[in-house]
């Protein structure tokens, strides 16, 4: 691929829902394969890639709490869902010859390695795609927060959030035809306006560590490589 990438190392955050495709639940393997191909294109540009995937296509911890259940147990179940998704993505990457590893915030040595910042950066230095599973390993934190945390730990140049739409809008464009898309915002503007892109803890953590957030549609084939080359349609959240 041609074009010099704007970033050397990035953290990609993908929602669990993105893996569902047109299904109502679970993993659409064709979608996992497409995301894997996008990551392969990014690697062909020389960009080091870390990935955090949500678990909402399988389970959400807040769903337990909303029905009177134990939120901590629910969040633990959600963390396990992210491990399932991470293993699925690793399988898709393996099929196309991309070397990758899953590091979990929850110890499960028979399934994947445990996370450590030092090992994660070492793997990325070797050119491996590192998939971070298990969220932060703690309840009450979203996978958005986990993505911002891992981005800071690996010293990522940018946090890319692949969503259902091509950027940040003033309202849900699927519900409000008058919603306007922003080309750029500051972290403070996102927080002050309460824009639904990532939870406030994630945005604040990215701001504190001077990490730009780039929001784009994960459903565009080759979209990740386009963004990395500064060509794609997106919203950039940065204080610079």
UniProtKB/Swiss-Prot annotation:
<feature type="binding site">
    <location>
        <begin position="136"/>
        <end position="143"/>
    </location>
    <ligand>
        <name>UMP</name>
    </ligand>
</feature>
<keyword id="KW-0963">Cytoplasm</keyword>
<feature type="binding site">
    <location>
        <position position="56"/>
    </location>
    <ligand>
        <name>ATP</name>
    </ligand>
</feature>
<keyword id="KW-0808">Transferase</keyword>
<keyword id="KW-0547">Nucleotide-binding</keyword>
<feature type="binding site">
    <location>
        <position position="163"/>
    </location>
    <ligand>
        <name>ATP</name>
    </ligand>
</feature>
<feature type="binding site">
    <location>
        <position position="75"/>
    </location>
    <ligand>
        <name>UMP</name>
    </ligand>
</feature>
<dbReference type="GO" id="GO:0033862">
    <property type="term" value="F:UMP kinase activity"/>
</dbReference>
<protein>
    <recommendedName>
        <fullName>Uridylate kinase</fullName>
        <ecNumber>2.7.4.22</ecNumber>
    </recommendedName>
</protein>
<dbReference type="GO" id="GO:0005829">
    <property type="term" value="C:cytosol"/>
</dbReference>
<dbReference type="GO" id="GO:0006225">
    <property type="term" value="P:UDP biosynthetic process"/>
</dbReference>
<feature type="binding site">
    <location>
        <position position="60"/>
    </location>
    <ligand>
        <name>ATP</name>
    </ligand>
</feature>
<dbReference type="Pfam" id="PF00696">
    <property type="entry name" value="AA_kinase"/>
</dbReference>
<dbReference type="InterPro" id="IPR001048">
    <property type="entry name" value="Asp/Glu/Uridylate_kinase"/>
</dbReference>
<feature type="binding site">
    <location>
        <position position="164"/>
    </location>
    <ligand>
        <name>ATP</name>
    </ligand>
</feature>
<keyword id="KW-0418">Kinase</keyword>
<dbReference type="GO" id="GO:0044210">
    <property type="term" value="P:'de novo' CTP biosynthetic process"/>
</dbReference>
<dbReference type="InterPro" id="IPR036393">
    <property type="entry name" value="AceGlu_kinase-like_sf"/>
</dbReference>
<feature type="binding site">
    <location>
        <position position="169"/>
    </location>
    <ligand>
        <name>ATP</name>
    </ligand>
</feature>
<comment type="function">
    <text>Catalyzes the reversible phosphorylation of UMP to UDP.</text>
</comment>
<dbReference type="GO" id="GO:0005524">
    <property type="term" value="F:ATP binding"/>
</dbReference>
<comment type="pathway">
    <text>Pyrimidine metabolism; CTP biosynthesis via de novo pathway; UDP from UMP (UMPK route): step 1/1.</text>
</comment>
<comment type="similarity">
    <text>Belongs to the UMP kinase family.</text>
</comment>
<dbReference type="InterPro" id="IPR011817">
    <property type="entry name" value="Uridylate_kinase"/>
</dbReference>
<feature type="binding site">
    <location>
        <position position="55"/>
    </location>
    <ligand>
        <name>UMP</name>
    </ligand>
</feature>
<keyword id="KW-0067">ATP-binding</keyword>
<keyword id="KW-0021">Allosteric enzyme</keyword>
<comment type="subunit">
    <text>Homohexamer.</text>
</comment>
<feature type="binding site">
    <location>
        <position position="172"/>
    </location>
    <ligand>
        <name>ATP</name>
    </ligand>
</feature>
<keyword id="KW-0665">Pyrimidine biosynthesis</keyword>
<dbReference type="InterPro" id="IPR015963">
    <property type="entry name" value="Uridylate_kinase_bac"/>
</dbReference>
<feature type="region of interest" description="Involved in allosteric activation by GTP">
    <location>
        <begin position="21"/>
        <end position="26"/>
    </location>
</feature>
<feature type="binding site">
    <location>
        <begin position="13"/>
        <end position="16"/>
    </location>
    <ligand>
        <name>ATP</name>
    </ligand>
</feature>
